[in-house]
Amino acid sequence: MGLIVQKFGGTSVGSVEKIQNAANRAIAEKQKGHQVVVVVSAMGKSTDELVSLAKAISDQPSKREMDMLLATGEQVTISLLSMALQEKGYDAVSYTGWQAGIRTEAIHGNARITDIDTSVLADQLEKGKIVIVAGFQGMTEDCEITTLGRGGSDTTAVALAAALKADKCDIYTDVPGVFTTDPRYVKSARKLEGISYDEMLELANLGAGVLHPRAVEFAKNYQVPLEVRSSTETEAGTLIEEESSMEQNLIVRGIAFEDQITRVTIYGLTSGLTTLSTIFTTLAKRNINVDIIIQTQAEDKTGISFSVKTEDADQTVAVLEEYKDALEFEKIETESKLAKVSIVGSGMVSNPGVAAEMFAVLAQKNILIKMVSTSEIKVSTVVSENDMVKAVESLHDAFELSKHPSAV
């Protein structure tokens, strides 16, 4: 048969009972004749607890020592899961990220995987063992332990699936799949049977928290089929692969949204591309991520608006004021309590007028659009936070996302 990589996040292994459930999931695939690799996160909120311990010792602990500390969380899970499998009569073996051959950049706290030596894992799989690997971690060429940052366990699972040429990578979570939008806000949200890599990447980048963008990008680059599944239910989840044929007649596949957005507007800039380049280069050096950008021109002066996360707004203004003389602008204004609402679907490429329909729906609901950004398969709008849920519900209804494609 084939090779399956399974990944269980922190909530899916947050107790002994849940670890037993993960063991049963691995056994079910083993009984089908598959080779099985299981990637796990630290149990529950144990990573947060480790961070709290570090903060109790030091306000600014070194990144190296933080990686040394945080990497221990997954080691607890792999050991317990391996024990659970052995207790059920299955031969299992656990490995840390570095024992599994995962090599990374020398960037503590947010390293990227550079290479995987699969020889140890392949040998154990050939012996018929279920292999358990700690997610979120690896080692540099200089034998320094690193962690992969947010979504690191997802990335570990997909990277191992690619390196081992697995048939599929199953991501087990506390939700049964990828929905047309967040069902906590829109009760009629529907679980998707399938979605393309590109669509999932857009949704992930726009705030859909089911998968980390880096993991989706890895899966797309190496053509690893992903399935997002419930860790507590047995029904099929959402399959993520190259341009899914499952729901082709959907123009819009899903709606993503996030609040706590701030618009920053700079007035009276001296015209010139060099000035704009300086602004965004300066912000990037301070790790401030700029999203939607709008430029206006009035005679010999330029105005520019862009959006940032509200948590970065004060720092953004401080940095710009620091360089005010060099940038030669008149003033800065900010508007907070905004939200970004985006529609995503590969069907937009061949169906003009989707953006116009989106704007018309929002206008009918008296929702003021403050900023707009588009790509081939996405349209994003910035609206008031107070209008966010109404906008999502209205667009979900207008594009009939609650209906199965066969009924649309």
UniProtKB/Swiss-Prot annotation:
Q: Name one GO biological process term.
A: diaminopimelate biosynthetic process
Q: In which pathway does it act?
A: Amino-acid biosynthesis; L-lysine biosynthesis via DAP pathway; (S)-tetrahydrodipicolinate from L-aspartate: step 1/4; Amino-acid biosynthesis; L-methionine biosynthesis via de novo pathway; L-homoserine from L-aspartate: step 1/3; Amino-acid biosynthesis; L-threonine biosynthesis; L-threonine from L-aspartate: step 1/5
Sorted alphabetically, which keywords does the UniProt record give? Amino-acid biosynthesis, ATP-binding, Diaminopimelate biosynthesis, Kinase, Lysine biosynthesis, Nucleotide-binding, Repeat, Transferase
Residues where substrate binds? 25-30, 47-49, 74, 125-126, 150-153, 289-291, 295, 354-355, 368-369, 375-376
Q: Name one GO cellular component term.
A: cytosol
Does the keyword DNA damage belong to this entry? no
Cite the ACT domain residue spans from the record. 264-337, 343-408
Q: Which is an annotated Pfam family here?
A: AA_kinase
Substrates-to-products reaction catalysed: L-aspartate + ATP = 4-phospho-L-aspartate + ADP
Question: Which Gene Ontology MF annotations are present?
Answer: aspartate kinase activity; ATP binding
Q: What is its EC number?
A: 2.7.2.4
Q: Which domain of life is it from?
A: Bacteria
Residues noted as binding ATP in the record, renumbered to the chain? K7, F8, G9, G10, S41, T173, D174, F179, T180, T181, D182, P183, R184
Query: What residue ranges carry the coiled-coil annotation?
Result: none
- Activity control summary: Lysine-sensitive. Regulated by degradation in response to starvation of cells for various nutrients. Ammonium starvation induced the fastest aspartokinase II decline, followed by amino acid starvation and glucose limitation.
Tell me which residues are marked as the site Contribution to the catalysis: K7, E74
Task: Write out the function statement from the record.
Answer: Catalyzes the phosphorylation of the beta-carboxyl group of aspartic acid with ATP to yield 4-phospho-L-aspartate, which is involved in the branched biosynthetic pathway leading to the biosynthesis of amino acids threonine, isoleucine and methionine.
PANTHER family in the cross-refs = ASPARTATE KINASE, ASPARTOKINASE 2
The entry's family comment says: Belongs to the aspartokinase family.
Under the subunit heading, UniProt states: Tetramer consisting of 2 isoforms Alpha (catalytic and regulation) and of a homodimer of 2 isoforms Beta (regulation).
Q: What is this protein called?
A: Aspartokinase 2
